């Protein structure tokens, strides 16, 4: 019996024999760039085309808004607003925004620590005055009981 591989080899052999006898105009219509690999046809890899001269190493520029100009000043990129060019690169703006983000996060960390220290100091002062949540709740409940008792007497 013929195996599948044997049939494929025989068909390929017949195809090559017939291809030699075919006239040249018909042969030219066939894609000559195809390669035969294990009986399969594949297109050759195309080399990447060189970029055109006008777009090589060109970074798109951005006209900064007033707020973005302030960000550039606060980040220390420029000393005065007059020094800021009319158009800047996105990378410069991103770097300035990242610096501001870091500065704001440091400020928030410092404010959080200062708030914690303030709350600890206030808590210690309240403890010296013997003020606690438990004592405040007991006083409030006692006051509510008195008001309820007075209301019951009045009715």
Swiss-Prot record:
Location of this chain's protein in the cell: Mitochondrion membrane
Required for proapoptotic activity: annotated span: 77-103
Membrane topology (UniProt): Single-pass membrane protein
InterPro entries cross-referenced by the UniProt entry: DUF1075
Any one annotated GO CC term: mitochondrial membrane
Domain of life, source organism: Eukaryota
Keyword annotations of the record: Apoptosis, Membrane, Mitochondrion, Transmembrane, Transmembrane helix
Chain segments annotated as transmembrane: 102-121
GO biological process: cellular response to hypoxia; neuron apoptotic process; positive regulation of apoptotic process; positive regulation of release of cytochrome c from mitochondria
Pfam families (alphabetical): DUF1075 (PF06388)
Subunit-level organization: Interacts with HSP90AB1; HSP90AB1 is essential for FAM162A mitochondrial localization and pro-apoptotic activity. Interacts with VDAC2; the interaction is probably involved in inducing mitochondrial permeability transition.
Function recorded in the entry: Proposed to be involved in regulation of apoptosis; the exact mechanism may differ between cell types/tissues. May be involved in hypoxia-induced cell death of transformed cells implicating cytochrome C release and caspase activation (such as CASP9) and inducing mitochondrial permeability transition. May be involved in hypoxia-induced cell death of neuronal cells probably by promoting release of AIFM1 from mitochondria to cytoplasm and its translocation to the nucleus; however, the involvement of caspases has been reported conflictingly.
Family under the similarity heading: Belongs to the UPF0389 family.
PANTHER family: GROWTH AND TRANSFORMATION-DEPENDENT PROTEIN, PROTEIN FAM162A
Protein name: Protein FAM162A
Species annotation: Rattus norvegicus
Taxonomic lineage from the root: Eukaryota, Metazoa, Chordata, Craniata, Vertebrata
